[in-house]
Amino acid sequence: MRLDAGRSLWLLILALTAVRLWAAAVIPLTEDEAYYRLWSQHLHFGYYDHPPMIAWWIWLGTTLAGDTPLGVRLLPVLGAAVTTWLTADLARRLGGGARTALLAALAYNAMLTIGAGGLIATPDAPAILFWAATLAVLGRIATGGSPRLWLLAGLTAGLACISKYSALFLAPGVFLWLLSTAENRRRLATPWPWSAVGVAGLVFATNLAWNATHGWLTFEKQFGRVEPSQFRPGYLGEFLTTQFVLLNPLIAVLAGVGVWAGMRSRGRVGRLDLSLPLLAALPFCLYLAIHSLHDRVQAHWPATVFAAFALAAAAAVEARPRGWRPRVLGGGLILGAAAMAGVLAWAGLQGPPINSRTDPLLPIRGWPQFAGEVEAARVRTGAEWVGVAHYGALSQLAATGRIEAPLVHLIERERWPDAGPAPVDKPGLVLDKSRRLSLADLQACFRSVTPVGELVRGVPTSRVDRYPLFRVEGPVEGLLARGCPDELGKNRRRQAAAPIPPPRGAWPAQRTGGGS
Protein backbone atom coordinates (compact mmCIF):
# COMPACT_ATOMS: atom_id res chain seq x y z
CA MET A 1 0.00 0.00 0.00
CA ARG A 2 1.37 3.38 -0.98
CA LEU A 3 1.36 5.91 1.85
CA ASP A 4 0.14 9.42 1.22
CA ALA A 5 2.17 12.42 2.37
CA GLY A 6 0.02 13.00 5.44
CA ARG A 7 0.49 9.49 6.80
CA SER A 8 4.16 9.57 5.89
CA LEU A 9 4.56 12.68 8.02
CA TRP A 10 3.16 10.95 11.09
CA LEU A 11 5.29 7.87 10.49
CA LEU A 12 8.34 10.10 10.19
CA ILE A 13 7.56 11.82 13.48
CA LEU A 14 6.93 8.52 15.28
CA ALA A 15 10.09 6.90 13.90
CA LEU A 16 12.30 9.86 14.80
CA THR A 17 10.80 10.07 18.27
CA ALA A 18 11.41 6.37 18.89
CA VAL A 19 15.06 6.70 17.85
CA ARG A 20 15.54 9.80 19.99
CA LEU A 21 13.92 8.18 23.02
CA TRP A 22 16.35 5.27 22.74
CA ALA A 23 19.30 7.61 22.39
CA ALA A 24 18.06 9.81 25.23
CA ALA A 25 17.97 6.79 27.52
CA VAL A 26 21.43 5.38 26.73
CA ILE A 27 23.65 8.40 26.02
CA PRO A 28 25.22 9.79 29.23
CA LEU A 29 24.35 13.34 30.17
CA THR A 30 26.53 16.19 28.98
CA GLU A 31 27.95 18.58 31.56
CA ASP A 32 25.35 21.24 30.78
CA GLU A 33 22.49 18.75 30.97
CA ALA A 34 23.71 17.58 34.37
CA TYR A 35 23.93 21.23 35.41
CA TYR A 36 20.36 22.00 34.30
CA ARG A 37 19.26 18.85 36.12
CA LEU A 38 20.44 20.46 39.35
CA TRP A 39 18.41 23.55 38.46
CA SER A 40 15.31 21.38 38.14
CA GLN A 41 15.65 20.34 41.78
CA HIS A 42 15.29 23.98 42.86
CA LEU A 43 12.61 25.59 40.70
CA HIS A 44 12.78 29.35 40.20
CA PHE A 45 11.85 31.98 37.62
CA GLY A 46 15.49 32.45 36.66
CA TYR A 47 19.02 31.12 37.00
CA TYR A 48 22.59 32.31 36.60
CA ASP A 49 22.99 31.42 32.92
CA HIS A 50 19.50 31.32 31.42
CA PRO A 51 15.78 31.83 31.97
CA PRO A 52 13.97 28.97 33.72
CA MET A 53 12.09 26.95 31.10
CA ILE A 54 14.63 24.14 30.67
CA ALA A 55 14.64 23.56 34.44
CA TRP A 56 10.85 23.28 34.42
CA TRP A 57 10.97 20.85 31.50
CA ILE A 58 13.54 18.66 33.22
CA TRP A 59 11.53 18.71 36.44
CA LEU A 60 8.45 17.48 34.56
CA GLY A 61 10.45 14.88 32.62
CA THR A 62 12.14 13.44 35.68
CA THR A 63 8.81 13.42 37.51
CA LEU A 64 7.32 11.32 34.70
CA ALA A 65 10.30 9.13 33.73
CA GLY A 66 12.55 9.17 36.77
CA ASP A 67 15.83 10.89 37.59
CA THR A 68 17.61 9.34 34.62
CA PRO A 69 19.01 10.60 31.32
CA LEU A 70 15.68 9.71 29.69
CA GLY A 71 13.80 11.72 32.30
CA VAL A 72 16.09 14.71 31.80
CA ARG A 73 15.60 14.58 28.02
CA LEU A 74 11.97 13.46 27.77
CA LEU A 75 10.48 16.90 27.14
CA PRO A 76 13.17 17.94 24.61
CA VAL A 77 12.52 14.73 22.62
CA LEU A 78 8.77 15.29 22.64
CA GLY A 79 9.38 18.95 21.85
CA ALA A 80 11.37 17.99 18.74
CA ALA A 81 8.42 15.88 17.58
CA VAL A 82 5.98 18.76 18.10
CA THR A 83 8.32 21.20 16.34
CA THR A 84 8.47 18.87 13.34
CA TRP A 85 4.67 18.86 13.16
CA LEU A 86 4.51 22.65 13.61
CA THR A 87 6.98 23.15 10.77
CA ALA A 88 4.87 20.95 8.50
CA ASP A 89 1.68 22.71 9.59
CA LEU A 90 3.21 26.10 8.84
CA ALA A 91 4.18 24.89 5.37
CA ARG A 92 0.52 24.08 4.71
CA ARG A 93 -0.67 27.40 6.14
CA LEU A 94 1.75 29.31 3.94
CA GLY A 95 0.30 27.79 0.77
CA GLY A 96 1.92 24.39 0.40
CA GLY A 97 0.22 21.03 0.16
CA ALA A 98 0.74 17.84 2.12
CA ARG A 99 3.81 16.96 0.06
CA THR A 100 5.41 20.33 0.76
CA ALA A 101 4.71 19.87 4.46
CA LEU A 102 6.40 16.47 4.40
CA LEU A 103 9.43 17.86 2.55
CA ALA A 104 9.76 20.66 5.11
CA ALA A 105 9.64 18.15 7.98
CA LEU A 106 12.21 15.94 6.27
CA ALA A 107 14.53 18.85 5.52
CA TYR A 108 14.25 20.09 9.11
CA ASN A 109 15.25 16.76 10.63
CA ALA A 110 18.01 16.23 8.07
CA MET A 111 19.78 19.26 9.49
CA LEU A 112 22.68 17.95 11.54
CA THR A 113 21.99 20.16 14.56
CA ILE A 114 18.37 19.00 14.70
CA GLY A 115 18.75 15.37 13.65
CA ALA A 116 21.50 14.45 16.09
CA GLY A 117 20.90 17.19 18.64
CA GLY A 118 17.12 17.05 18.88
CA LEU A 119 17.25 15.17 22.17
CA ILE A 120 19.68 17.31 24.17
CA ALA A 121 18.22 19.08 27.21
CA THR A 122 19.46 22.65 26.84
CA PRO A 123 17.57 25.97 26.74
CA ASP A 124 17.55 25.72 22.94
CA ALA A 125 15.02 22.88 23.10
CA PRO A 126 12.07 24.85 24.52
CA ALA A 127 13.13 28.01 22.67
CA ILE A 128 12.96 26.18 19.33
CA LEU A 129 9.54 24.75 20.14
CA PHE A 130 7.94 27.99 21.30
CA TRP A 131 9.47 30.01 18.43
CA ALA A 132 7.97 27.52 15.97
CA ALA A 133 4.66 27.54 17.86
CA THR A 134 4.48 31.33 17.62
CA LEU A 135 5.01 31.22 13.86
CA ALA A 136 2.43 28.43 13.50
CA VAL A 137 -0.17 30.51 15.34
CA LEU A 138 0.65 33.58 13.26
CA GLY A 139 0.33 31.43 10.14
CA ARG A 140 -3.21 30.58 11.17
CA ILE A 141 -3.98 34.25 11.77
CA ALA A 142 -2.59 35.15 8.35
CA THR A 143 -4.90 32.63 6.68
CA GLY A 144 -8.11 33.85 8.27
CA GLY A 145 -7.90 32.53 11.82
CA SER A 146 -9.64 34.24 14.70
CA PRO A 147 -7.92 37.43 15.88
CA ARG A 148 -8.11 36.00 19.40
CA LEU A 149 -5.25 33.75 18.34
CA TRP A 150 -3.03 36.77 18.88
CA LEU A 151 -3.32 36.08 22.61
CA LEU A 152 -1.99 32.56 22.06
CA ALA A 153 0.83 33.95 19.92
CA GLY A 154 1.74 36.31 22.76
CA LEU A 155 1.76 33.42 25.21
CA THR A 156 4.03 31.23 23.07
CA ALA A 157 6.35 34.16 22.34
CA GLY A 158 6.59 34.89 26.06
CA LEU A 159 7.36 31.25 26.79
CA ALA A 160 10.08 31.37 24.12
CA CYS A 161 11.61 34.39 25.87
CA ILE A 162 11.72 32.65 29.26
CA SER A 163 13.36 29.72 27.49
CA LYS A 164 16.24 31.67 25.98
CA TYR A 165 16.81 35.39 25.60
CA SER A 166 17.57 35.08 21.89
CA ALA A 167 13.81 34.66 21.42
CA LEU A 168 13.49 38.40 22.16
CA PHE A 169 14.51 38.88 18.52
CA LEU A 170 11.21 37.29 17.51
CA ALA A 171 9.31 40.50 18.36
CA PRO A 172 11.08 42.80 15.87
CA GLY A 173 10.90 40.03 13.28
CA VAL A 174 7.14 39.72 13.61
CA PHE A 175 6.87 43.51 13.50
CA LEU A 176 8.75 43.52 10.18
CA TRP A 177 6.26 40.96 8.89
CA LEU A 178 3.34 43.13 10.02
CA LEU A 179 4.81 46.07 8.13
CA SER A 180 5.43 44.07 4.97
CA THR A 181 1.93 44.21 3.41
CA ALA A 182 -1.08 46.51 3.50
CA GLU A 183 -3.24 43.74 4.96
CA ASN A 184 -0.77 43.17 7.78
CA ARG A 185 -0.45 46.89 8.45
CA ARG A 186 -4.22 47.04 8.93
CA ARG A 187 -3.81 44.45 11.69
CA LEU A 188 -1.63 46.93 13.56
CA ALA A 189 -4.63 49.26 13.74
CA THR A 190 -6.49 46.67 15.84
CA PRO A 191 -5.81 45.95 19.52
CA TRP A 192 -4.93 42.31 18.94
CA PRO A 193 -1.20 42.49 18.08
CA TRP A 194 -0.69 44.88 20.99
CA SER A 195 -2.58 42.51 23.27
CA ALA A 196 -0.11 39.81 22.22
CA VAL A 197 2.75 42.10 23.23
CA GLY A 198 1.09 42.55 26.61
CA VAL A 199 0.66 38.81 27.16
CA ALA A 200 4.27 38.13 26.17
CA GLY A 201 5.41 40.92 28.47
CA LEU A 202 3.50 39.49 31.41
CA VAL A 203 5.11 36.09 30.90
CA PHE A 204 8.58 37.60 30.56
CA ALA A 205 8.01 39.80 33.62
CA THR A 206 8.34 36.72 35.82
CA ASN A 207 11.99 36.41 34.83
CA LEU A 208 12.54 40.17 35.05
CA ALA A 209 11.25 40.15 38.62
CA TRP A 210 13.57 37.27 39.56
CA ASN A 211 16.56 39.07 38.08
CA ALA A 212 15.65 42.29 39.88
CA THR A 213 15.87 40.47 43.22
CA HIS A 214 19.08 38.60 42.34
CA GLY A 215 21.40 41.36 41.19
CA TRP A 216 20.42 40.98 37.50
CA LEU A 217 22.49 37.80 37.42
CA THR A 218 21.26 36.38 34.13
CA PHE A 219 21.20 39.70 32.33
CA GLU A 220 24.79 40.43 33.33
CA LYS A 221 25.86 36.97 32.20
CA GLN A 222 24.04 36.94 28.85
CA PHE A 223 23.90 40.56 27.73
CA GLY A 224 27.57 40.98 28.47
CA ARG A 225 28.04 39.27 25.10
CA VAL A 226 26.87 42.41 23.28
CA GLU A 227 29.58 44.65 24.72
CA PRO A 228 31.81 46.07 21.96
CA SER A 229 35.24 44.52 21.59
CA GLN A 230 38.03 44.21 19.05
CA PHE A 231 37.00 43.91 15.39
CA ARG A 232 37.71 40.33 14.28
CA PRO A 233 35.95 39.64 10.97
CA GLY A 234 37.49 36.18 10.75
CA TYR A 235 34.76 34.93 13.06
CA LEU A 236 32.17 35.73 10.38
CA GLY A 237 33.69 33.19 8.01
CA GLU A 238 33.85 30.64 10.81
CA PHE A 239 30.19 31.30 11.64
CA LEU A 240 28.99 30.92 8.05
CA THR A 241 31.09 27.81 7.43
CA THR A 242 29.96 26.13 10.64
CA GLN A 243 26.30 26.80 9.97
CA PHE A 244 26.62 25.62 6.37
CA VAL A 245 27.85 22.29 7.72
CA LEU A 246 25.37 22.03 10.60
CA LEU A 247 22.41 22.88 8.39
CA ASN A 248 23.57 19.94 6.24
CA PRO A 249 25.47 21.27 3.20
CA LEU A 250 22.95 19.95 0.67
CA ILE A 251 19.95 21.27 2.62
CA ALA A 252 21.81 24.56 3.06
CA VAL A 253 22.16 24.92 -0.72
CA LEU A 254 18.42 24.46 -1.20
CA ALA A 255 17.65 26.79 1.69
CA GLY A 256 19.88 29.41 0.11
CA VAL A 257 18.03 29.03 -3.19
CA GLY A 258 14.71 29.41 -1.40
CA VAL A 259 15.79 32.44 0.61
CA TRP A 260 17.21 34.13 -2.50
CA ALA A 261 14.02 33.48 -4.44
CA GLY A 262 11.97 34.83 -1.55
CA MET A 263 14.07 38.00 -1.39
CA ARG A 264 13.44 38.62 -5.09
CA SER A 265 9.68 38.08 -4.93
CA ARG A 266 8.60 39.55 -1.59
CA GLY A 267 8.69 36.20 0.15
CA ARG A 268 6.84 34.09 -2.38
CA VAL A 269 8.61 30.95 -3.60
CA GLY A 270 6.39 28.87 -5.84
CA ARG A 271 3.12 28.41 -3.97
CA LEU A 272 4.60 29.25 -0.56
CA ASP A 273 4.64 32.70 1.02
CA LEU A 274 7.79 32.61 3.14
CA SER A 275 7.64 36.22 4.31
CA LEU A 276 6.54 35.28 7.85
CA PRO A 277 9.29 32.78 8.77
CA LEU A 278 12.03 34.65 6.91
CA LEU A 279 11.24 38.11 8.26
CA ALA A 280 10.76 36.68 11.75
CA ALA A 281 14.27 35.19 11.54
CA LEU A 282 15.93 38.25 10.00
CA PRO A 283 16.73 40.34 13.13
CA PHE A 284 18.29 37.39 14.94
CA CYS A 285 20.33 36.41 11.88
CA LEU A 286 21.58 40.00 11.55
CA TYR A 287 22.55 40.06 15.22
CA LEU A 288 24.50 36.81 14.87
CA ALA A 289 26.33 38.17 11.82
CA ILE A 290 27.23 41.37 13.68
CA HIS A 291 28.28 39.43 16.77
CA SER A 292 30.57 37.29 14.62
CA LEU A 293 32.51 40.43 13.63
CA HIS A 294 34.01 40.63 17.12
CA ASP A 295 33.46 37.26 18.81
CA ARG A 296 32.72 33.60 18.15
CA VAL A 297 29.11 32.51 17.55
CA GLN A 298 28.50 29.19 19.26
CA ALA A 299 27.36 26.47 16.88
CA HIS A 300 23.91 25.95 18.42
CA TRP A 301 22.85 29.57 18.76
CA PRO A 302 20.98 29.87 15.42
CA ALA A 303 18.93 26.68 15.95
CA THR A 304 15.67 28.58 16.54
CA VAL A 305 15.62 29.79 12.92
CA PHE A 306 16.44 26.43 11.31
CA ALA A 307 12.76 25.69 10.70
CA ALA A 308 12.59 28.78 8.48
CA PHE A 309 15.46 27.43 6.39
CA ALA A 310 13.77 24.03 6.17
CA LEU A 311 10.66 25.75 4.79
CA ALA A 312 12.82 27.64 2.29
CA ALA A 313 14.46 24.39 1.15
CA ALA A 314 11.09 22.68 0.71
CA ALA A 315 9.73 25.67 -1.20
CA ALA A 316 12.74 25.66 -3.52
CA VAL A 317 12.15 22.01 -4.39
CA GLU A 318 8.41 22.46 -4.89
CA ALA A 319 8.96 25.49 -7.13
CA ARG A 320 11.08 23.34 -9.50
CA PRO A 321 9.95 19.73 -8.96
CA ARG A 322 12.07 18.55 -11.91
CA GLY A 323 15.79 18.89 -12.39
CA TRP A 324 18.61 19.03 -9.87
CA ARG A 325 16.75 20.28 -6.81
CA PRO A 326 14.89 17.06 -5.89
CA ARG A 327 18.12 15.11 -6.35
CA VAL A 328 20.00 17.46 -4.03
CA LEU A 329 17.22 17.11 -1.47
CA GLY A 330 17.40 13.32 -1.72
CA GLY A 331 21.14 13.43 -1.17
CA GLY A 332 20.66 15.76 1.78
CA LEU A 333 18.15 13.43 3.38
CA ILE A 334 20.51 10.47 3.01
CA LEU A 335 23.39 12.50 4.45
CA GLY A 336 21.26 13.71 7.37
CA ALA A 337 19.94 10.23 8.17
CA ALA A 338 23.42 8.73 8.03
CA ALA A 339 24.87 11.45 10.25
CA MET A 340 22.06 11.13 12.78
CA ALA A 341 22.31 7.34 12.91
CA GLY A 342 26.10 7.40 13.14
CA VAL A 343 26.34 10.03 15.86
CA LEU A 344 23.56 8.61 18.02
CA ALA A 345 24.78 5.02 17.67
CA TRP A 346 28.39 5.97 18.42
CA ALA A 347 27.42 8.03 21.48
CA GLY A 348 24.77 5.57 22.65
CA LEU A 349 27.05 2.56 22.38
CA GLN A 350 30.06 4.52 23.71
CA GLY A 351 32.13 3.82 20.64
CA PRO A 352 35.92 4.04 20.68
CA PRO A 353 37.89 7.29 20.32
CA ILE A 354 38.70 8.46 16.81
CA ASN A 355 42.44 8.14 17.43
CA SER A 356 45.06 8.49 20.16
CA ARG A 357 44.56 12.26 20.35
CA THR A 358 40.86 12.76 19.63
CA ASP A 359 37.91 11.52 21.66
CA PRO A 360 34.77 13.64 21.15
CA LEU A 361 32.95 11.50 23.73
CA LEU A 362 35.49 12.22 26.48
CA PRO A 363 33.28 14.87 28.19
CA ILE A 364 30.57 12.23 28.84
CA ARG A 365 32.71 9.12 29.37
CA GLY A 366 33.17 7.25 32.61
CA TRP A 367 31.57 9.57 35.14
CA PRO A 368 29.96 6.86 37.33
CA GLN A 369 33.23 4.94 37.68
CA PHE A 370 35.16 8.18 38.19
CA ALA A 371 32.73 9.32 40.91
CA GLY A 372 33.18 6.00 42.67
CA GLU A 373 36.94 6.55 42.68
CA VAL A 374 36.47 10.09 44.02
CA GLU A 375 34.28 8.77 46.84
CA ALA A 376 36.86 6.11 47.69
CA ALA A 377 39.58 8.78 47.83
CA ARG A 378 37.38 10.96 50.06
CA VAL A 379 36.84 8.13 52.53
CA ARG A 380 40.53 7.19 52.46
CA THR A 381 41.65 10.75 53.23
CA GLY A 382 39.02 11.44 55.90
CA ALA A 383 37.50 14.34 53.95
CA GLU A 384 33.97 15.44 54.85
CA TRP A 385 33.18 17.29 51.62
CA VAL A 386 34.28 17.31 47.97
CA GLY A 387 35.14 20.58 46.24
CA VAL A 388 35.53 21.37 42.53
CA ALA A 389 36.36 24.46 40.51
CA HIS A 390 33.97 23.91 37.60
CA TYR A 391 30.19 23.68 37.58
CA GLY A 392 30.24 20.90 34.98
CA ALA A 393 32.38 18.58 37.09
CA LEU A 394 30.20 19.22 40.14
CA SER A 395 27.04 18.56 38.13
CA GLN A 396 28.34 15.31 36.66
CA LEU A 397 29.49 14.04 40.05
CA ALA A 398 26.11 14.92 41.54
CA ALA A 399 24.24 13.15 38.74
CA THR A 400 25.96 9.85 39.48
CA GLY A 401 24.63 9.78 43.04
CA ARG A 402 27.88 8.14 44.20
CA ILE A 403 29.32 10.94 46.31
CA GLU A 404 28.23 10.42 49.92
CA ALA A 405 29.26 13.87 51.14
CA PRO A 406 28.34 17.47 50.26
CA LEU A 407 29.64 18.76 46.93
CA VAL A 408 30.97 22.32 47.00
CA HIS A 409 31.57 24.63 44.04
CA LEU A 410 34.53 26.72 45.14
CA ILE A 411 33.95 29.56 42.66
CA GLU A 412 30.93 31.23 41.04
CA ARG A 413 28.74 30.62 44.06
CA GLU A 414 26.15 32.87 42.41
CA ARG A 415 25.25 29.89 40.24
CA TRP A 416 23.53 28.38 43.29
CA PRO A 417 21.17 30.96 44.85
CA ASP A 418 19.75 28.36 47.25
CA ALA A 419 23.12 27.03 48.37
CA GLY A 420 23.22 26.37 52.06
CA PRO A 421 26.31 26.84 54.22
CA ALA A 422 29.18 24.80 52.80
CA PRO A 423 31.13 22.75 55.40
CA VAL A 424 34.51 24.09 54.28
CA ASP A 425 35.67 24.48 57.90
CA LYS A 426 36.09 20.70 57.98
CA PRO A 427 38.68 18.64 56.05
CA GLY A 428 37.82 18.41 52.36
CA LEU A 429 38.93 16.75 49.13
CA VAL A 430 39.36 19.18 46.23
CA LEU A 431 39.82 18.10 42.62
CA ASP A 432 39.41 19.32 39.07
CA LYS A 433 41.22 19.17 35.76
CA SER A 434 44.85 20.17 36.13
CA ARG A 435 44.38 23.16 33.82
CA ARG A 436 41.67 24.55 36.12
CA LEU A 437 43.29 23.97 39.49
CA SER A 438 46.81 24.28 40.89
CA LEU A 439 48.55 23.77 44.21
CA ALA A 440 49.27 27.51 44.34
CA ASP A 441 45.57 28.33 43.96
CA LEU A 442 44.63 26.16 46.91
CA GLN A 443 47.52 27.32 49.11
CA ALA A 444 46.07 30.83 48.84
CA CYS A 445 42.71 29.51 50.04
CA PHE A 446 43.55 26.93 52.71
CA ARG A 447 46.17 26.81 55.46
CA SER A 448 46.86 23.12 54.85
CA VAL A 449 46.99 21.65 51.34
CA THR A 450 48.29 18.13 50.78
CA PRO A 451 48.46 16.45 47.35
CA VAL A 452 46.97 12.96 47.71
CA GLY A 453 47.16 11.58 44.19
CA GLU A 454 45.58 11.86 40.78
CA LEU A 455 42.58 10.29 39.06
CA VAL A 456 42.14 9.76 35.33
CA ARG A 457 38.90 9.71 33.35
CA GLY A 458 38.69 8.48 29.77
CA VAL A 459 39.94 5.70 27.52
CA PRO A 460 43.63 4.95 28.22
CA THR A 461 44.43 4.53 24.51
CA SER A 462 43.37 8.12 23.74
CA ARG A 463 43.42 11.54 25.33
CA VAL A 464 42.22 11.49 28.94
CA ASP A 465 41.31 14.07 31.58
CA ARG A 466 43.57 14.15 34.63
CA TYR A 467 42.33 15.33 38.01
CA PRO A 468 44.88 16.06 40.77
CA LEU A 469 43.51 15.46 44.28
CA PHE A 470 44.22 17.68 47.30
CA ARG A 471 43.25 17.24 50.93
CA VAL A 472 42.56 20.70 52.35
CA GLU A 473 41.98 22.14 55.83
CA GLY A 474 41.73 25.58 57.41
CA PRO A 475 39.96 27.86 54.91
CA VAL A 476 40.95 31.51 54.85
CA GLU A 477 38.35 34.00 56.00
CA GLY A 478 35.71 34.74 53.37
CA LEU A 479 36.78 31.81 51.21
CA LEU A 480 33.44 31.33 49.47
CA ALA A 481 32.89 35.07 49.00
CA ARG A 482 36.26 35.33 47.27
CA GLY A 483 36.11 32.04 45.49
CA CYS A 484 39.03 29.74 45.01
CA PRO A 485 40.78 30.79 42.79
CA ASP A 486 40.13 34.35 44.02
CA GLU A 487 37.07 36.02 42.49
CA LEU A 488 36.60 38.63 45.20
CA GLY A 489 36.47 41.62 42.85
CA LYS A 490 33.76 40.09 40.67
CA ASN A 491 31.64 39.08 43.65
CA ARG A 492 32.00 42.48 45.31
CA ARG A 493 30.72 44.24 42.17
CA ARG A 494 27.74 41.91 42.00
CA GLN A 495 26.93 42.22 45.71
CA ALA A 496 27.12 46.01 45.50
CA ALA A 497 24.39 45.89 42.86
CA ALA A 498 22.01 43.66 44.82
CA PRO A 499 22.98 41.08 47.44
CA ILE A 500 21.82 37.53 46.86
CA PRO A 501 19.09 36.62 49.37
CA PRO A 502 20.02 34.43 52.32
CA PRO A 503 20.24 30.66 51.72
CA ARG A 504 16.94 28.80 51.68
CA GLY A 505 18.08 25.22 51.20
CA ALA A 506 20.89 22.87 50.40
CA TRP A 507 22.04 23.04 46.80
CA PRO A 508 23.72 21.03 45.40
CA ALA A 509 22.04 18.28 47.33
CA GLN A 510 24.10 15.66 49.11
CA ARG A 511 22.62 12.61 47.41
CA THR A 512 21.39 13.64 43.98
CA GLY A 513 20.85 10.31 42.27
CA GLY A 514 20.24 9.56 38.65
CA GLY A 515 22.50 7.93 36.18
CA SER A 516 24.72 9.46 33.56
Give residue ranges: language-model regions.
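Membrane-interface alpha helices of multi-pass inner-membrane proteins
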Residues: 104-105, 137, 149-165, 199-202, ...
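Transmembrane-helix motifs of polytopic, lipid-linked glycan transferases
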Residues: 10, 74-95, 110, 133, ...
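Transmembrane-lumen/periplasm boundary regions of multi-pass, lipid-linked membrane glycan transferases
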Residues: 19, 159, 171-274, 280-295
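Membrane-interface transmembrane helices that cradle and orient dolichyl/undecaprenyl
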Residues: 2, 92-95, 134-150, 257, ...
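Short acidic/glycine- and proline-prone juxtamembrane loop motifs at membrane-interface regions
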Residues: 113-127
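Specific aromatic-rich, kink-prone transmembrane helix
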Residues: 41, 84-86, 126-144, 149-157, ...
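Membrane-proximal, lumen/periplasm-facing interface regions of secretory-pathway glyco-
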Residues: 299, 324-382, 391-416, 431-479, ...
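Short helix- or helix-capping micro-motifs
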Residues: 13, 101-109, 157, 161, ...
